Amino acid sequence: FIEMLPDSNVLRKIHADKVEDLDVAAMLDKINERITYLYDREHTIGHAFFTGLQGEHATLENLKHIFEKSIIPLLQEYFYEDYQKIQLVLGDNAKSSDELKFILDEKIVARNVFKGSIEAVIDLPEKRYTINKAALEDIRSYKEIL
């Protein structure tokens, strides 16, 4: 067995490292640095997800598809739907506006959801999380991961 960790240089070598003016390889490195910090290096995102972004296929639409169908679901699995950590990995905590966040959070007020006393119930969620489809279609959302 030979360990094969993600290698963003592969993307550079095969010219799959740019979508518009986004440095895909640098974005992958930043995502993996955060995953390593929050989880471990064995769960980093492989460069193979992005190798199809070559030539005419280096489009925002293809990048969106990779994130929507592969990267975000993988992060949901890795972090057991701990969306705060997913937000950290994707840089949503530091985005210049909410419209660029991949994961939106909305405060939930329990008394607006339930009738009667709920004090006896512990660990009620304080936020509801949703995937922001519009952010997936905006190149700035990906740039602000960096």
State where each predicted segment sits.
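C-terminal regulatory/interaction module of P-loop NTP-utilizing enzymes
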Residues: F1-L146
